[in-house]
């Protein structure tokens, strides 16, 4: 879909689309002079439950929650979300209703899933511009399988597997031919989108019926909140743990900080790079099959521009384009900011021709605010 749409309380399932791209300043390089990288990673994981002065141990998940909540990397985007929501709510009080706020969260979910994977790639100085096409192709593939009588859950799992295979394809192209990922995935963007059009004949394909259990799950609610939001929250929690509390996440950040030093220290750079692309493709597949269950159709036009949305959300949330740093929570918050912008444009009846301009301007302001706040913290931090 090439135009932005937002549900103003009608209950219709509409797909949001915005597009932008931003940049962030480079982050300081990480260093590991005394401990080889793999051992340092293992140490960071094993230290997650260190003894406290009282003799007890702090569970690793508690330390993870404290670390995420205590982080200030994404305070700028959080302030922007609250400020924009208040501005819209003052002018249009209906926006602050619980049903509308949960709808904004749901609108953000599909981009947030992609943005989480994009943050992992950006952390190691890579990029996947084909993720929007993967999103569409996997939804079409799953819809075809369901159309031929396959169980919807099995078809959804196969669709996610297709996404993983497409991500692996991207990684192999980048690695085997030594191509910059932006060039390789720019090509596969067109290839995967073309496949989606070819196998669907350019038409929407009906997915599971509304009574199907997969459709009920993808389009259902629990405690008034869409199930897709719970999926996004769970994904953010898992990937945050992976990024900060596993050797895999440590190696991603190490490669992004200094690829040569990472390779010299024994990190399997090629394997980690391939796994990161597979993860990105898997998340593209997850988003695609969830959209199939939610919207009720596989559409080759789905996800157009989502690659730029995912990059923008990740960067707005605090992930560095220069590598070495990523925040999964920030990527999700960046997606929510984009959804709030889309809602504001709809509520203020901004002409469609001005949507891209207004969206880009708001995103730029959010990035500048976030950058200024982080620069101020850096200047105020003690020098060693």
Positions of predicted regions on the chain:
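Loop-to-transmembrane alpha-helix initiation sites
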Residues: 107, 152, 181, 225-232, ...
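Hydrophobic core segments of alpha-helical transmembrane domains in multi-pass membrane transport
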Residues: 77-89, 118, 193, 231-242, ...
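Transmembrane helix-bundle core of multi-pass membrane transporters
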Residues: 181-246, 272-275, 294-303, 379-384
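Transmembrane alpha-helical segments in multi-pass inner-membrane proteins
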Residues: 284, 294-359
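Cytosolic-side transmembrane-helix boundaries in multi-pass membrane proteins
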Residues: 2-81, 257, 264-271, 343-384
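Structural signal for alpha-helical transmembrane segments and their membrane-water exit/capping regions
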Residues: 80-96, 124, 196-200, 205, ...
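Single transmembrane alpha-helix segments in multi-pass membrane proteins
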Residues: 84-148, 173-179, 314, 318-328, ...
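Helix-loop-helix "hairpin" substructures at the membrane interface of multi-pass membrane proteins
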Residues: 151-159, 164-170, 174, 221-299
